[in-house]
Amino acid sequence: MFLHRSKLSGLTVGLALALAMSATAEACERADRQPIMVTVGADGMPEVDTDSLTVCEGDTVRWIFRGTARQFSILFTSAEDSPFDWKQQTGATVTGTVRQGAVKDGQETSYKYDVKVGEKTLDPKIIVVP
């Protein structure tokens, strides 16, 4: 009798875990991420084609300078305040993969960052969803 109850209990726990994992997988919808295009406006200010980007842990984000190859920087205030495993990257193309743990306390987590071209800065954000 105890063996039967133990198997049933294990089955219940396994089913609950599978359902929870399924709900988590559905919560963060993966999309074919297009690169974020970085340009410079007539006023010299950096511009991006999306001011707010929603991503999942494990997604790869890529910024590309549109136009003549030009260096730009993606900067976060600190490594702890970055959804990536880096604080700053510079180049004509910048790529980062959203790290595990970027979602804090199981809640949607917003990260402000700077796009810097020369001395001009723009401050969009990345939102990481569970």
Kindly label every feature range from the protein language model.
Residues 2-12:
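Bacterial N-terminal signal peptides that target proteins for export
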Residues 28-60:
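N-terminal edge beta-strand
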Residues 12-20:
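Bacterial N-terminal signal peptides
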Residues 88-130:
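Extracellular/periplasmic metallocenter environments
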Residues 74-90:
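Short, compositionally biased
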Residues 63:
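Residue-level hotspots at or immediately adjacent to binding/recognition sites across diverse folds
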